Amino acid sequence: MKRLQRIWQKKSRIALGMMAGTSTDGVDVALTRISGRGLASSVHLLSFATYPFSAQMRNRILQLLSARTEEICEMNFIVGEILADCALKLLAHAGYKPEQIDFIGSHGQTIYHLSGAAGRRNSTLQIGEGAIIAARTGVITVCDFRPADIAAGGTGAPLVPYADFVLFRKKGKVRALLNLGGIANVTIVPGRLEEVIAFDTGPGNMVLDGLVALKFQGRKRCDVDGQIAARGKVDKNLLRDLMRHPYLKRQPPKSTGRETFGEGLVKSLWEQGNGMPFADLITTATYFTAAAVHRSFLKFIFPSFKVDEIFVSGGGRHNRTLMA
């Protein structure tokens, strides 16, 4: 506790953050200097890198959605070793030693996320054992962010609203921060912290990536730059069916994950698209992501906020067809 108190009392702290998202494509690692405390904090990025998962590791992680307990138990420690290695790699690249780091924040890799399911308790599970990271690096490691959010009465996602407010608030402006990851989420940053809202809008890249992986049997992971979608046409009947998904009707706060928009939906779309040009199927799925975001703004954001600016992040920002 004394060590934590000393860190809190410092005028600035060196922190390393790690995130593995629902796209399951790798680990983002950021080394930062945080000055000040609370809402008065400022963050300076010192170094950043993304370390991709190998195709074999990505497949092993994706299979955990329906794996045996022993496999999940083992992978918790395997992914912990991967995360520790990623942390040490970035420190070496940036010219820092572990003893110079005040703390590590590690999200881990989400395996299952239950939110708003009828008759089920909100719950979430991430792997990437924090004790492994702490032992390998010798640095205080903070984890279990999503379980902590649920314990405090949240849904476990999105996790970024407080940081979004600290980093992006601007007097006299209402900003929307849209993240197009595997799942798409949005944070609305008005003038006051108590007015902030955030929720998952629906699928981001997850459905698109799943369809591409099926089509190319794993040789491709995504529709690079939206090139496939740019060649196709929207199947209006299929899009209409997709937009009837019950998640899109739920009121925020809400969150979702691979359990809802993952393999099950991808296989269903694949079967429904049998006989349809693949480009049309991808175009329709791309429009599904865009339409879900659009509906979220119309139903849940614009009635309460006049948005001045929208910032887009996540892998989906590279998809030109989606961004169009």
Describe the predicted segments one by one.
Residues A84-G95, D164-R169, E271, A290-I301:
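Generic structural signal for well-ordered alpha-helical scaffold segments
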Residues R6, K11, A20, D25-G26, ...:
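Catalytic phosphate/nucleotide-handling subdomain of diverse soluble enzymes
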Residues K10, T24-V27, Q56, E74, ...:
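Conserved active-site and cofactor/substrate-binding residues in soluble primary-metabolism enzymes
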Residues L65-G128:
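Short beta-strand-loop/turn "lid" adjacent to the catalytic site in phosphate-handling enzymes
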Residues M1-K10, Y96, I111-A131, T141-C143, ...:
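Nucleotide/phosphate-binding catalytic cleft detector across ATP-hydrolyzing
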Residues G218-E309, N319-A324:
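A contiguous, well-structured pocket-lining segment that forms one wall/lid of small-molecule binding clefts
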Residues I14-L16, V174-L178, F311:
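Conserved beta-strand elements of the Class I
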